Amino acid sequence: MTKGTTSMGQRHGRTHILCRRCGRNSYHVQWERCAACAYPRASRRRYNWSVKAIKRRRTGTGRCRYLKVVNRRIANHFKTPKA
């Protein structure tokens, strides 16, 4: 078997699977470490040289269930409904 480009076509195994924390296909099976969020490390992987990547993951990109409620309450000056 040669060691160049032809041997690259022989690869069938999966190196990465879905990550529990970020949900991306970046969890390395052998190293047991996510390439995207560094799970299982407590602090998330985040570098300043990838500002675009940080913007993709930060607050406001998901469902924002609680933030929607807070914004509505701010607009109404935190008035409580009268029964």
UniProtKB/Swiss-Prot annotation:
Q: Where are the zinc fingers (C4-type)?
A: 19-37
Q: Which residues form a coiled coil?
A: none
Cofactor remark from the record: Binds 1 zinc ion per subunit.
Q: Which domain of life is it from?
A: Eukaryota
Q: Which UniProt keywords apply?
A: Metal-binding, Ribonucleoprotein, Ribosomal protein, RNA-binding, rRNA-binding, Zinc, Zinc-finger
Annotated GO molecular function terms are:
rRNA binding; structural constituent of ribosome; zinc ion binding
Pfam families listed in its UniProt record: Ribosomal_L37e
Listed GO CC annotations: cytosolic large ribosomal subunit
Q: Which residues cross the membrane?
A: none
InterPro entries on file: Ribosomal_eL37, Ribosomal_eL37/eL43, Ribosomal_eL37_CS, Ribosomal_zn-bd
Q: Which GO terms describe its biological process?
A: translation
Q: Where is the signal peptide?
A: none
Chain residues that bind Zn(2+): 19, 22, 34, 37
Q: What are the required cofactors?
A: Zn(2+)
Q: Briefly state the protein's biological role.
A: Binds to the 23S rRNA.
* Other notes: There are two genes for L37 in L.infantum.
Similarity section: Belongs to the eukaryotic ribosomal protein eL37 family.
The name of this protein is Large ribosomal subunit protein eL37
